[in-house]
From Swiss-Prot:
HAMAP family given in the database record: ManNAc_kinase
InterPro entries per the UniProt record, alphabetical: ATPase_NBD, ManNAc_kinase_bac, ROK, ROK_cs
Domain of life: Bacteria
Protein name, as recorded: N-acetylmannosamine kinase
Length: 291
């Protein structure tokens, strides 16, 4: 059975056909609409899936935000242009006439990355560092989503009580500091207004402020990982996302994690499926996992 998998992120929308063998075909991308209206997202999703839906038997969505009862509830609305609520499952069922499931994108990615690991590993945490910071937890070989879908939203744990206000309403969240949006928001002077990609480029060219911003992000993530180890005693942490997979970033995180007491050390791995982990995880869950 072929699954039409969709990944909804703060920067881009992706879709692909994924067979029972896990092979990705006909991958497509569109930018996430900047508009705050549900109609803009519906129109973008329609354009994304219309060339693919005739070749699929079901739809599986991995989306940023809390997924509850098939709807997207934005914990940080800034990541989706201010969109607070969107009926994901209902919308895709109307667009495709196919049975549809939905799950948080980082939770989906955690499940895909877990499947790629050795069989003796039962406990992992996946962290995506991209437009925002998200996570997914696999404990005892089971994906933990929580009764309200909030499990794994580790980007909204406290990093600095005197830090910037996060879009979720809290102050000093990991996401407000370590994410691509957080890196860009802290830029000043010549870098003011630059996005995270530009800041990484400037860091590679030796720009001191750009390097400091990236170190700040990596240090914040390392402290989060130490907290995660203390909370879950996971066997490894897998890091993905456009920032998490940027050249040299994971090595920086490892350097800062090594400065923590040894009890809080844990193996760090780059995401095996790179930017396709959410798509694959959603498809895998559609094949047999009850959500």
């Amino acid at each position: 059975m072929t699954t039409l998998a969709i990944d909804i992120g703060g920067t881009k929308l992706a879709a692909a056909l994924i067979g029972a063998d896990g092979q990705i075909r006909d991958r497509r991308e569109l930018p996430t609409p900047a508009s705050q209206t549900p109609q803009a997202l519906r129109d973008a999703l329609s354009a994304l899936v219309s060339p693919l839906q005739a070749h699929a038997q079901r739809v599986a969505i991995a989306s940023t935000g809390i997924i509850r009862d098939g709807s997207l509830l934005a914990l940080n609305p800034h990541n989706l242009g201010g969109l607070l609520h969107f009926p994901l499952v209902k919308t895709l069922e109307q667009l495709t006439n196919l049975p549809t499931i939905a799950i948080n994108d980082a939770q989906a990615a955690a499940w895909a990355e877990y499947q790629a690991l050795d069989g003796d590993i039962t406990d992992i945490v996946f962290i995506t560092v991209s437009t925002g910071v998200g996570g997914g937890v696999v404990s005892g070989g089971k994906l933990r989503t929580g009764p309200g879908g909030l499990a794994g939203h580790i980007g909204h744990t406290l990093a600095d009580p005197h830090g910037p206000v996060c879009g979720c309403g809290r102050t000093g969240c990991v996401e407000a500091i370590a994410s691509g949006r957080g890196i860009a928001a802290a830029a000043q002077g010549e870098l003011a207004g630059a996005n995270a990609k530009t800041i990484f480029t400037r860091a590679g060219q030796g720009d001191e402020q750009a390097q400091q911003l990236i170190h700040r992000s990596a240090r914040t993530l390392a402290r989060l990982i130490a907290d995660i180890k203390a909370t879950t005693d996971c066997q490894c942490v897998v890091v993905g996302g456009s920032v998490g997979l940027a050249e040299g970033y994971l090595a920086l995180v490892e350097t800062y994690l090594a400065q923590e007491p040894e009890a809080f050390h844990v193996d760090l791995l780059a995401a095996h499926y790179r930017h396709d982990a959410g798509l694959l995880g959603a498809a895998l869950l559609a094949q047999g996992e009850k959500l």
